[in-house]
Amino acid sequence: MSRSLIQTTNTTPAAVAVNGIIPLGSVLRRFGCNCRLNGNNIEVEGTGYYTVEGTVTVQPAAAGAVSVALFENNVAVPSAVATGTAAAIGDDVTLPISTTVRETCCEGASSLALVLTDGASTVTNVSLRVEKE
């Protein structure tokens, strides 16, 4: 079993609508060939488990709930949803994501994306790390 890692970061503010994919920015660190950045998605390829850890900071366009979820191949990963509440417009809300996903034999690459699932916001900071165990 080989280890691979990718870490991305984005500090450029971006307006994201509900159900919009959050821009991951650029690669900060990368090792191995099982994880790669493809647009605003991380592609993972190779049988095994992948630990996904990330933090998204948003400034909601309205007071109330805001949520971020990890999607794998356009399907929400049930254990990877973070929700916070903004007391006022523009409050910083930090949303942590931490989970493990499994890549099985012979599927080809899987695509991982962070999606804003509730509360249109300006995303001000994103850090995402995916590591093959």
Residue spans of the language-model regions?
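Extracellular jelly-roll beta-sandwich "head" domains, especially the C-terminal globular C1q domain
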Residues: 1-133
